């Protein structure tokens, strides 16, 4: 009698630092056993791969038996190479599953061989991940073939490579994740998403092979109806905040089930998300630093104190909230000595997370150090804008638009006036409101700091990497 399969192999393409794979890895059975095992995870970026490898390494230890060396590494007492040398067996296993490879024609044979080896004769496994969103800008292959350089475009290769991997290995199930923007993207006036649905339904036909044979039924995770080419593709959209995630992240998830299988996925169960305050409010308060001219607590306070309440009152010209905003600014300026003194903190208290059930798996009772909780440096002018914006949000319950700023605080950019009059983006300085979920966290946080202003005026800064990671539901020990 065949042995019952206790966990399902997962092949993770375009894995990044491992976020999607982490979700599968944390899915447990009735006895607490892992339901999925990542046997191949492929990522080409060096830094993302380092994070991916470390996480695969950690998964080879039981949750209640993680080595103290891992926590010593997080505390900076040993480096990553020391950690791996002390646990060579686990490192060897992780190195075999977390792979730094560029997907494409040059590595197609290698990737095919690796997946064949790891899947072997297993009949129940899943392919997860999806090509970077840029791949779909050239998805209309039949209409684009005449364009110079199309065949050499990497984006074209990435999308075709994804389809070829499906054809090569015929996974029973695939889960393709991608950006909401696919719903509005068009090539030659035709919706890109329609072509993608057609390609995923019949992958062989998509690459010019036979029109019959391998095929998939495509399902939504948020709706009962099975979408097809004639059904509104918006059914594939998953609004993360509807399912317990503390950010308004809207992503497309297409679940493909091979045609010969008589199964269908269930729907995600909606439940309320934790608020921003519940998710990051327990982290140590840290102040921003000054990016130019040297940083010190005294100079930082002096720069913020230059925000003149009288000027603000005059320029707001008696708006509804003027008195409360001015009062809030003056109160915080006089209490400046009681705010955070440092721009970083490694202190971690295991019970700092609020009691929301969606946050329970972020904890690690053995962790005593916090990584990546360091505020960015900002220009003095931005400090005052952040301070004003967070006070405004505290008083009004909303993030200010450009038209809500005193002119003395506005940057001297042409786009600012266009924003004030509604002709361009009107909210380049966006406060993350404490009693709501966060707006979507981007992968380039350092470039988009203005969009992620902390709600606490006394900290006067954008979100730290650790705060952003927590809002993306990475566990607190993810490094």
Outline where the language-model segments fall.
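Core alpha/beta nucleotide-donor-binding catalytic domains of modification enzymes
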Residues: 2-9, 15, 19-169, 180-194, ...
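Active-site-proximal structural scaffolding
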Residues: 3-6, 13, 45, 189, ...
């Amino acid at each position: 009698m065949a042995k019952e399969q206790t966990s399902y192999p997962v092949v993770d393409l375009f894995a990044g630092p491992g976020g999607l794979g982490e979700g599968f890895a944390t899915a447990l059975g009735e006895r607490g056993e892992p339901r999925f095992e990542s046997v191949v995870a492929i990522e080409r970026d060096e830094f993302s791969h380092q994070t991916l490898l470390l996480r695969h390494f950690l998964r080879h230890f039981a949750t209640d038996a993680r080595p103290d060396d891992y926590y010593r590494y997080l505390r900076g007492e040993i480096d990553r190479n020391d950690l791996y040398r002390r646990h060579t067996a686990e490192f060897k296993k992780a190195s075999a599953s977390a792979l730094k490879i560029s997907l494409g024609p040059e590595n197609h044979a290698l990737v095919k061989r690796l997946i064949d080896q790891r899947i072997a004769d297993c009949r129940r496994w899943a392919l997860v991940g999806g090509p970077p969103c840029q791949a779909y800008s050239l998805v209309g292959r039949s209409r684009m073939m005449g364009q110079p350089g199309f065949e050499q475009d990497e984006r074209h290769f990435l999308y075709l490579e994804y389809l070829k991997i499906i054809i090569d290995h015929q996974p029973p199930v695939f889960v393709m994740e991608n950006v909401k923007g696919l719903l509005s993207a068009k090539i030659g006036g035709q919706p890109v998403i329609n072509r993608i649905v057609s390609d995923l339904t019949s992958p062989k036909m998509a690459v010019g092979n036979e029109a019959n044979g391998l095929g998939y039924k495509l399902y939504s995770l948020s709706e009962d109806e099975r979408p097809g080419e004639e059904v509104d593709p918006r059914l594939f959209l998953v609004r993360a905040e509807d399912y317990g995630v503390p950010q308004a992240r809207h992503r497309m998830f297409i679940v493909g089930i091979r045609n010969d299988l008589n199964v269908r996925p269930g729907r995600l169960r909606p439940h309320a998300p934790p608020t921003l305050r519940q998710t990051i409010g327990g982290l140590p308060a840290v102040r921003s630093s000054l990016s130019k001219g040297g940083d010190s607590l005294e100079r930082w306070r002096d720069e913020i104190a230059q925000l003149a309440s009288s000027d603000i009152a005059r320029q707001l010209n008696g708006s509804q909230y003027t008195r409360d905003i001015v009062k809030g600014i003056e109160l915080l300026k006089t209490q400046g000595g009681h705010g955070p003194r440092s721009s970083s903190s490694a202190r971690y208290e295991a019970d700092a997370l609020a009691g929301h059930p969606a946050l329970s798996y972020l904890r690690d009772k053995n962790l005593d150090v916090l990584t990546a909780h360091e505020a960015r440096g900002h220009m003095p002018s931005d400090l005052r804008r952040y301070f004003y914006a967070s006070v405004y949000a505290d008083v009004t319950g909303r993030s200010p638009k450009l038209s809500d700023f005193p002119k003395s605080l506005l940057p001297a950019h042409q786009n600012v006036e266009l924003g004030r009059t509604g002709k361009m983006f009107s909210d380049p300085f966006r406060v993350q409101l404490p009693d709501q979920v966060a707006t979507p966290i981007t992968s380039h946080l350092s470039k988009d700091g203005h969009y992620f202003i902390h709600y606490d005026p006394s900290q006067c800064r954008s979100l730290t990497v650790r705060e952003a990671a927590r809002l993306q539901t990475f566990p607190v020990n993810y490094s």
